[in-house]
């Protein structure tokens, strides 16, 4: 458990010479605070940092955050079930949804399988990304077990008109184009953006994969491709200094095609539309806001055997969520936040089999209603801060399953409606006895993850494995306690260390159950108890006005504490991670950001089989750019590399490999 670890580019928001320059964060408490002034363990990536990073999507900019591991099994060639974010050991295995993803404060996880499709939003629409490590169900409800990722979109400019365009080209015929335009007219402002990312010719299947061997002659490596299109629109109207209305909508399309020499075969496609609105009013005594969001997703997955398309599995997911929040002060000591929230989701999926008469259809509906209360108590002129909070959640789900060989007279099973409730408390303490020289933090929180509709009523076939649902699943529960210290001996140097332990029960996992009809059967079950013990540390140093040094590290043990695999690790969760690097930015010279990240062993199943373990590799990246400013416009050519390694192949899992040594050249311009 003890690797010192250095601080990442992902948290460069903490790299400021003056404390007054620290960014504002809102996710930890739903109220505005400067970074480092909350009891929670928070990191931020700002817009300025994103523009300096060698990144293609949101996943890439979180790669070097402390306590955060990006399991990008197939990079931008992969789906959201293959590309995951793991926070404090949660979120890495094949059961999704232990890390909650928000957009502008509202959940954006799909109703069926509780994942966020990382390809649905372009980096050009992102203002900043806030990551809260540790349980957050006391504010946000289900799924906030390991932490919360809040993607905050860019607000339109308040005056004038601005436009930026960019393009880059690199290995595997990877090509990205993007556009962002914003303007303001009196009290009204707007922003529009669009992006395209294409790549062609990379084989995501490892050379050692049995499936690769059996299909080697049929593999269409020259034509396997991915295409990702994004578009977004933001509108804002400011009524006066105390009230405003903002609307943000986005559309995206992702396709991964051409893997085999099979006509009409699409490995995976995902089409998404989302729209959110927020009405805010400061009444003086009370600051209030109402937010609502709708997400609509359609996906399709094709399966194949050698040269034959064997099945297709289209799915449709719809989600509506809302939140009404109020913040008010009571005297000089108390700042209360009270609110109500809710969500509704619907999921429908089917599987059509072309080599048999079999047909499956499944789906369901879910409803969640909740209320939350939090008090930020400031004592002794802010030297002691205590933040208690609690949230009540009620949820109900109902579903159906049809699995038959008789399409004419199908046997459909309707499951009775089930409901559950959960109280989620938290308590945070921050002690600052010496004006930010040394700050002590400690947090206790309880969290939960309600079984998804896919867990309860779904299931799927992926390759040679068939995953079955279980309508009797219980919610996952966890309790976490952490203790941390922030040391700021000078304005240029900051050190943060946090240790934590999580006790979880009724963890859901896919348990192997032998074979059926030629498939490896895996059924979702509650495996009872899990503990995760870990430490995360980061350090950054502002050497001078232009040079910043950073490093971070994480070590943890995610352990199964009951059942047949007692004492073994949770699978697909790296147990060690370290990142280090620097940013040099001189307005008259150039900007260079470079970093390297090491991942330790990644167990592939619950048996701790070392023969099939992955991990133990370094990956580097850099971006070098130079900006030229002219009277009415600017130009910034750049070169960048991603996935730099000396290895022939990099794998997070046995079944996937990532594109490596990706070299890009590009140009951005603004006017």
What does each model-identified segment do?
Residues 106-133:
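Short acidic/polar hinge/loop motifs at secondary-structure boundaries
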Residues 150, 158-160, 166-168, 180-268:
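Periplasmic-side early beta-strands and strand-to-turn transitions of outer-membrane beta-barrels
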Residues 199-203, 222-228, 242-288, 292-319, ...:
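Flexible loop and strand-edge segments within Gram-negative outer membrane beta-barrel domains
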Residues 255, 298-300, 346-351, 394-409, ...:
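Surface-exposed extracellular loop regions of Gram-negative outer-membrane beta-barrel proteins
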Residues 333-336, 378-386, 394, 496, ...:
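Gram-negative outer-membrane beta-barrel transporters
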Residues 59, 63-106:
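Extracytoplasmic beta-strand/coil segments of soluble accessory domains associated
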Residues 12-13, 193, 237-238, 375, ...:
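Conserved C-terminal beta-signal and adjacent last beta-strands/turns
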Residues 264-282, 315-317, 364-368, 413-424, ...:
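Outer-membrane beta-barrel signature, preferentially recognizing the C-terminal barrel domain
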């Amino acid at each position: 458990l003890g690797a010192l670890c250095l601080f990442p580019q992902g948290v460069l928001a903490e790299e400021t010479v003056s404390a007054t320059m620290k960014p504002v964060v809102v996710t930890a408490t739903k109220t505005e605070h400067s970074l480092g002034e909350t009891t929670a363990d928070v990191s931020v990536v700002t817009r300025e940092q994103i523009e300096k990073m060698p990144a293609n999507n949101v996943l890439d900019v979180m790669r070097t955050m402390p306590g955060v591991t990006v399991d990008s099994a197939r990079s931008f060639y992969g789906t959201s079930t293959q590309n995951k974010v793991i926070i404090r050991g949660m979120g890495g295995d094949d059961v999704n949804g232990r890390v909650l993803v928000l957009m502008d404060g509202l959940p954006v996880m799909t109703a069926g399988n509780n994942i966020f499709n990382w390809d649905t939003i372009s980096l050009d629409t992102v203002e900043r990304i806030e990551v809260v490590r540790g349980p957050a169900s006391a504010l946000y409800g289900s799924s906030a077990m390991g932490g919360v990722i809040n993607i905050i979109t860019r607000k339109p400019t308040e005056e004038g008109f601005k436009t930026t365009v960019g393009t880059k080209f690199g290995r595997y015929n990877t090509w990205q184009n993007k556009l962002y335009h914003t303007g303001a007219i009196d009290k009204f402002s707007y922003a529009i953006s669009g992006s395209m990312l294409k790549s062609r010719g990379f084989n995501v299947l490892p050379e050692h994969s049995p499936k690769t061997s059996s299909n080697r002659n049929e593999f269409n490596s020259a034509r396997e491709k991915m295409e990702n299109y994004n578009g977004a629109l933001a509108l804002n109207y400011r009524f006066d200094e105390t009230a405003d209305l903002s609307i943000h909508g986005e559309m995206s399309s992702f396709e991964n095609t051409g893997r085999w020499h099979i006509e009409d075969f699409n490995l995976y496609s995902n089409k998404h539309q989302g729209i959110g609105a927020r009405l805010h009013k400061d009444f003086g005594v009370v600051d209030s806001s109402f937010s609502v969001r709708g997400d609509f997703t359609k996906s399709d997955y094709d399966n194949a055997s050698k040269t034959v398309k064997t099945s297709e599995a289209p799915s449709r997911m719809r989600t509506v969520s809302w939140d009404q929040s109020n913040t008010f002060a009571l005297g000089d000591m108390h700042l209360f936040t009270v609110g109500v929230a809710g969500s509704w989701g619907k999921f429908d999926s089917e599987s059509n089999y072309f080599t048999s008469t079999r047909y499956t259809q499944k789906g369901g509906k879910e409803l969640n209603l909740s209320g939350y209360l939090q008090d930020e108590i400031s004592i002794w002129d802010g030297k002691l801060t205590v933040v208690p909070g609690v949230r009540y959640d009620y949820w109900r789900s109902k579903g159906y399953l049809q699995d038959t060989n008789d399409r004419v007279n199908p046997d459909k099973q309707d499951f009775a409606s089930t409901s559950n409730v959960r109280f989620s408390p938290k308590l945070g303490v921050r002690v600052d006895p010496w004006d930010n020289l040394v700050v002590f933090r400690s947090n206790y929180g309880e969290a939960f993850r309600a079984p998804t509709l896919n867990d309860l009523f779904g299931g799927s076939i992926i390759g040679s494995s068939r995953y079955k649902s279980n309508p009797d699943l219980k919610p996952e529960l966890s309790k976490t306690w952490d203790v941390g210290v922030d040391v700021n001996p000078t304005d240029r140097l900051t050190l943060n260390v946090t240790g934590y332990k999580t006790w979880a029960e009724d963890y859901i996992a896919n348990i192997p159950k032998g074979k059926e009809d030629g498939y490896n059967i895996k059924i979702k079950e509650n495996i009872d108890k899990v503990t995760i013990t870990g430490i995360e540390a980061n350090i950054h140093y502002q050497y001078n006005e232009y040079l910043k040094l950073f490093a971070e590290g994480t070590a943890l043990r995610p352990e199964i504490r009951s059942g047949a695999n007692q004492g073994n690790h949770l699978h697909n969760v790296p147990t060690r991670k370290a990142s280090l690097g620097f940013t040099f930015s001189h307005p008259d010279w150039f900007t260079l950001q470079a970093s390297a990240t090491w991942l330790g062993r990644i167990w592939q199943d619950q048996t701790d089989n070392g023969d099939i373990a992955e991990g133990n590799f370094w990956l580097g990246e850099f971006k070098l750019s130079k900006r030229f400013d002219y009277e009415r416009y600017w130009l910034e050519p750049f070169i960048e590399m991603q996935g730099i390694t000396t290895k022939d192949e990099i794998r997070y899992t046995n079944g996937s490999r990532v594109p490596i040594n990706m070299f890009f050249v590009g140009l951005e311009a603004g006017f």
